[in-house]
Amino acid sequence: MGFGDFDEICKKAALPLCSLVGPSSAISGSTGIIPNCYARNIELANTIIFEGAASFLHIIALGMTVIMILHIRSKFTAVGRKEIITFFYIYMALTVCSLVIDAGVVPPRSGPFPWFVAVQNGLTSALCTSLLVNGFVGFQLYEDGTALSVWLLRLTSTVMFAVSFLISILTFKSWGGLSPTNTLAMFIVLYIINAICIAVYLVMQLLLVLNTLEDRWPLGHIAFGLLVFIAGQVIMYAFGDVICDNVQHYLDGLFFATFCNLLAVMMVYKFWDYITKEDLEFSVGIKPNNWEIKELLPDEDRRTTVYQDTNSEYAGSMYHHRASTYNGHGY
């Protein structure tokens, strides 16, 4: 195996791009590297679903992402709110694309399949780039939530999406000097650059916690997220085929990688949620009536007014004791 080749990778892991790279078959004439083992298909309502377990996890990941986005949106004044929510929007788009590919909605060997896989690769690079830029937000090098901060994140993520997408589709289609057997550029973009982005993010968050925070609990979120992410990659690329054989093709490495990636993304959310504070005066909670009066004040403690004169013709008016319920406060 040479540097940049996908031969050994695709034999261990049933990645979608594996059917688009490698030498042409002498029999069929089509490209593709067949993995040693891959999860069996399932039939549901006369429909064949590929990678059933991984596809089910993608659906769970979508639900969890929606919940995390709603919680982020509720923290109205938290630092880096707009930036981190962009990261989760990209993750949601990547999950939808992965679900479409893994479940076989766009089957391999079909015309649109290379384009969908190229989009998946592009979203992967955009996600890692978004994570990298989010790593600098906490240092307040520039004001978070401003047009500069938000568009810096969006533009860098878009650029990396375009680079990864173009290199992938050029490789799959044998355009521009690239080919399914010349995968070095795609390997560098998908593995080397993305790994650098993740590593820089981790270093920046360690510096942020150690230099600016007294609480060390956020380090636990970072450590756990890193461990599960590494575990998922090791299982998929080193032991995926072994696990697949031992469970009779019900699961493969892609299932465990998807699960571990979800946990790692959840730890990114937990870390951000833990280190961010917000001004309670302007916060918007998910639950209504964040402020409420538990009991009424005694009569002697109530605010007196000029209308307390019992001789007044308005003393018995129903408007005398009216209380406003605006924002849960009594007036």
Curated annotation (Swiss-Prot):
One of its GO terms (molecular function) is unfolded protein binding. InterPro entries: Chs7. Its main location: endoplasmic reticulum. Keywords: Cell wall biogenesis/degradation, Endoplasmic reticulum, Membrane, Protein transport, Transmembrane, Transmembrane helix, Transport. It is found in: Endoplasmic reticulum membrane. It is a multi-pass membrane protein. The chain crosses the membrane at residues 52-72, 84-104, 113-133, 150-170, 184-204, 219-239, 249-269. One of its GO terms (biological process) is protein folding. PANTHER family: CHITIN SYNTHASE EXPORT CHAPERONE. Chaperone required for the export of the chitin synthase chs3 from the endoplasmic reticulum. Interacts with chs3. This is Chitin synthase export chaperone. It comes from Emericella nidulans (strain FGSC A4 / ATCC 38163 / CBS 112.46 / NRRL 194 / M139) (Aspergillus nidulans).
